[in-house]
Amino acid sequence: MCIRDRPISDDPLDYLPVEREFFPDIPVGNTPLWHPERLFKKHDFPELYFKDDGLNPTGSLKDRASLLVAAFAKKNYIDEVVVASTGNAGSSMAGVGAAAGLKVKLFLPKTAPPAKMIQSLQYGADLVLAEKNYDQAFALSIQYSKKFGGMNRNTAYNPMTIEGKKTVSIEIFNQLGRVPEHVFVSVGDGVILSGLYKGFRDLLQLKQISRMPEIHAIQASGSSAIFRAMSSGEFQEQPAETVADSISVNTPSNGYLALKNLKAYGGHCITLTAKEILSAQKELSSSCGLFSEPAAAAAYAGFIKQKQYLHSNSTCVVLLTGNGLKDINSASKIIVTPSKTINSLDELN
């Protein structure tokens, strides 16, 4: 039987360019597609869904890329992976690398959330802190891999990161049984966005779907390079500052491809304030038990902002890319923890 005659697989791993035997034994993917009644009724959007990739083994969607990178490394007898990260990609590669028996050299900005640093160290990564920011960590990791060897996993630098992340699109299609009208995703470097497009494009080329979804790229107002480039066509470096550390990037490494995809397929890009992001995070948690980090909750905040322009019967998927426990400091900014202690119930107000 030739390849073109084979039935199309429902298994996202079959869409990847490395044989199954090389993948480490760690349960990445197959994350739930939530349909929380309280939220779809609140917004009067009966087909509102949430893809919770914070339930991947290390707590973020980045595990999808790390899984493929690890498999590629094992197939090609590579024993060390080098990566720069704002936090999630690093802890992801460290965790998946541990399952694959790989050494991981991790470069993080010194401002990375402590939870992500501790998680990476628990997995056994060799951690190096860059003095300035993610962009500096990225540059240092490239220098390291060129000087000392090892495969560099960096987002937008290693093509396996886009390939790995495309599996989330295939899962969304499999779980819904159709392609959604709208997908909302937070964006920093642009690789998850490009991965989403790649997955749906693969399905389109295989005639599994007849159209692409409208993808809404959500950026923080303090880290909005792709939003600015949508009108200017250029990327100008501007210091990033946002409560959503996972999408905090001065100059997106995958910016031009992300921009090309958005324009080619009728995508949209909007920005949000820190208040909008944190408010959405709190609402997600308190309304249906979905505790996502600020960068992930930004996608939901984007839906809230854009829903006025959408038909209420359209199928909308909000992609939640990371677990809330990744960044407790940011989550605590709009909640008040009790300071008073009691000895008896009589002291309750």
Protein language model regions, located:
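PLP-dependent amino-acid enzyme catalytic core
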Residues: 4-349
